[in-house]
Regions:
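Short amphipathic C-terminal alpha-helix that caps PH/PH-like domains
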Residues: 1-5, 141-153
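Loop-rich catalytic cores of soluble enzymes, especially ATP-dependent carboxylate-amine ligases
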Residues: 1-131, 157-161
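Cationic, histidine-enriched alpha-helical/coil surfaces that engage anionic ligands
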Residues: 60, 72-96, 154-218
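A glycine-rich, aromatic-flanked flexible loop/lid motif
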Residues: 101, 107-126, 139-143, 163, ...
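Electropositive phosphate-/nucleotide-binding environments in soluble metabolic enzymes
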Residues: 103, 140, 197, 201
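Feature representing long, continuous alpha-helical segments
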Residues: 125, 144-148, 205
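Glycine- and acidic
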Residues: 125-134, 186-192
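Extended hydrophobic-aromatic, low-complexity segments
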Residues: 136-139, 158-159
Length: 218
């Protein structure tokens, strides 16, 4: 999800205007980040991370994300252990209420969610890049592109994230949000290419293959 974030936001960008000004092609991303960034200049200079966050490295386990949550972000509403009560179980699965409560105050653009839903307890990725509209067809197409591409890239022998630096993925994300379909992004073996060319010549076919493997008619 992180590796394709730049491409995803570039092809689906749909919020170029904010308060009468033309800003980024997907202005929702910088506006949301700035609107809840309470860090002072001193804290920024000290390296304190913003709560709206793309991340800073590839991870090997979802536990890495929850560990980062604890390491980098203090609770917004701290509660003493004596007031927390006994650990809650949802069937055979731990409820982890406070883990989820804390996780919900950190707005990653791809956020891991632990859902203790009884027999269907699971961990999923909440992809928060998808904009609204402009039409239902656009929404469905953007979602299909994302799911198909994630599936296809995840099935590759050598995953894309092993060939693309995290720094490059972050630059792609910013470029896609800023410049939309006119952005240029970095991609393994191709170097820096126009995102429209990358999507049309390479990624749409991969997304179709991924959807086909999920028995989705394209």
């Amino acid at each position: 999800s992180q590796a394709i974030a730049g491409v995803q936001v570039a092809v689906s960008a749909n919020s170029p205007l904010f308060m009468g000004h033309k800003l980024w092609h997907e202005s929702r991303i910088p506006v949301f980040k700035q609107s809840i960034d309470t860090r002072t200049k001193e804290l920024i200079n000290q390296g304190v991370r913003p709560r709206v966050w793309f991340g800073e490295r590839w991870i090997t386990s979802v536990f890495d994300l929850f560990e980062e949550n604890v390491r980098y972000f203090s609770p917004l509403l701290p509660e003493g252990r004596a007031d927390a009560g006994a650990p809650f179980m949802n069937g055979d699965n731990p409820g982890l209420h406070y883990l989820n409560l804390h996780n919900g105050t950190i707005w990653r653009w791809n956020r891991a969610i632990y859902d203790p839903a009884g027999e269907l307890s699971h961990i999923r990725v909440e992809n928060r890049l998808l904009p609204a509209g402009p039409t239902v067809k656009d929404l469905v197409a953007d979602a299909a592109f994302y799911y198909g591409l994630v599936k296809a890239l995840g099935n590759q022998t050598r995953p894309v994230w092993s060939r693309l630096s995290f720094e490059a993925a972050n630059r792609n994300f910013i470029a896609g949000a800023r410049n939309g379909i006119e952005a240029e992004v970095e991609w393994p073996t191709l170097g820096t290419v126009p995102v429209a060319e990358l999507a049309e010549k390479y990624l749409l076919e991969l997304a179709a293959e991924g959807l086909a493997s999920l028995d989705v008619d394209t």
